[in-house]
């Protein structure tokens, strides 16, 4: 991705798991992102979508798991995850859409 057309094309979905839920207290959020996006694009997209200040972005490429199917073996698609740390004093991101 050479240029950012829409920040919502970069941030695909939040990761909701026990680990990511525990990290919410530390202002750390995990998102599934576009595989071709870089840390700078992810930071700009998070700041535009959620109106927060990002302190750091770490990324991890996850290989798709090999799964059995009726006809043999298949493979889940590989994903890229971004671990986003918000700056101190930044408001939290509402991932669950609860009324304020």
From Swiss-Prot:
Keywords: Ribonucleoprotein, Ribosomal protein, RNA-binding, rRNA-binding. One of its GO terms (biological process) is translation. The keyword Ribosomal protein applies. InterPro entries: Nucleotide-bd_a/b_plait_sf, Ribosomal_uL23-like, Ribosomal_uL23/eL15/eS24_sf, Ribosomal_uL23_CS. GO terms for molecular function: rRNA binding; structural constituent of ribosome. GO terms for cellular component: ribonucleoprotein complex; ribosome. The keyword Transmembrane does not apply. Belongs to the universal ribosomal protein uL23 family. One of the early assembly proteins it binds 23S rRNA. One of the proteins that surrounds the polypeptide exit tunnel on the outside of the ribosome. Forms the main docking site for trigger factor binding to the ribosome. Part of the 50S ribosomal subunit. Contacts protein L29, and trigger factor when it is bound to the ribosome. This is Large ribosomal subunit protein uL23. It comes from Mycobacterium ulcerans (strain Agy99).
């Amino acid at each position: 991705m050479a240029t950012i057309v829409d920040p919502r094309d970069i941030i695909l979905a939040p990761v909701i798991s026990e680990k990511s839920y525990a990290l919410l207290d530390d202002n750390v959020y995990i998102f599934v992102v576009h595989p071709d996006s870089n840390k700078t694009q992810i930071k700009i997209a998070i700041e535009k979508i959620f109106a927060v200040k990002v302190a750091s972005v770490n990324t991890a490429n996850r290989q798709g798991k090999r799964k059995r199917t009726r006809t043999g073996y298949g493979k889940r698609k590989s994903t890229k995850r971004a671990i986003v740390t918000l700056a101190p004093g930044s408001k939290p991101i509402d991932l669950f859409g609860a009324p304020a």
